[in-house]
Structure formats: structure tokens, C-alpha cells
Amino acid sequence: MAVDEDKLNSFIGKAMGDLGAAVGAALVLIGDELGLYRALAAESLTSAELAARTGTTERYVREWLANQAAGGYVEYDAERDSYHLNEEQALCLADDSGPVDLPAAYSIVDDLFHVRERAVANFRTGAGMEWGEHHPCLFRATERFFRAGYNASLLPDWLPAMDGVVEKLDAGGSAADVGCGHGVTTILMAQAFPRSEFVG
């Protein structure tokens, strides 16, 4: 078999990029769970300061920061040997009430690793998988990821688009929020329409 070295190197380079992205995804989840992004959004910190602020170990934090800076997820200030999030990074990585919650999106992918063995079996048998059989991280992630859209659009846009719904809820109707997940939409409607009864 004749191997084209240029194609081989190109393919290996692509695969290494994908591998790096997979590792980076895990590190995003770690940074989110430990509050590292939120701390860096508040102020510029050295690795020791970030570790102290978040109750973590400096050595691990230093390695995490090096990865995140190399990947463009945090900014590095060489003069002070400190790190921070710029406005755009902070919006996407440290504000789970904002319009973009990237750690939540990464958590959706995390589910695939949790259900991998089940997926392998399904490939062999052709079986399916019920929504409720996914790992709990998927449900937390979808709630976080879609919350911004619900907050921005449910009350001002989506409900008024349905004829008579807002009026009925204002007057004191009853509503069943089917497939409501962790109940973000149900809670939003219950707060907006206190005369109505909501089940979700």
C-alpha cells in the first residue's frame, strides 16, 4: 500500500486538533464547575490568586490557565503574569444568565461520553434510547443552554404569538407545561401570571 505522506500528515494534524478540542471541552467543564471563569471575569488574577479565590490547588490551576490561554479562552498579561476574561469571553463563559452559555453547550456533549457504552450496544442491536435514559448532565445542560432563549422570548414573543393565550393566563387559566425539563418555562409563566395554575 502506497501512503501519501502529505495526506497522512494532514489527517494526523486534523485528528490531533480534534483530540485537543476534546481535552479542551473537558477543561471548560472543569473551569465552569470550579468557578474559575467567574473569578477571572471579575478581575485579573495570577494562578496563585485564582487558586486561593476558588479553593483549588495552584499547580492544577496553573496548568488549566496555560491550556485556556493557548486555546484563546482566557487572556494572559505577561507583564503581571496574570489572567482575565475579556468582555466577550466573560459573556460566553462566566454569565449563565446571558444570551450564550458555552459551558452548558459543552455539558450537552459530555452526555455522549456517559452513554457511550449504551450507544455502542444500540449500534449493534438497532435499539433506541428514551430521552429520560440519558445522563443527568444532559438535562442540567439543556436547561442552562436554553434558559437565555426562554428568558428573552417566552413572555414577550412566543406566548403572545398564540391567539388568546396571554389573556386567558391573565384571567386565571390552567396550563400544563409538557416536557418542561427542569421547569424554567413553567416558573417564568407562573411568575408572570399569578392568577393561573401551572403544572409542569
Report residues per predicted region.
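Conserved SAM-binding loop of SAM-dependent methyltransferases across substrates and taxa
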Residues: 182-195
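Conserved SAM-binding motif I beta-strand of class I
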Residues: 197-200
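Conserved Class I S-adenosyl-L-methionine-dependent methyltransferase catalytic core
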Residues: 2, 6, 14-33, 38-39, ...
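Conserved beta-strand/loop positions that form the S-adenosyl-L-methionine
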Residues: 178
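A short acidic, leucine-rich amphipathic alpha-helix
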Residues: 49-54
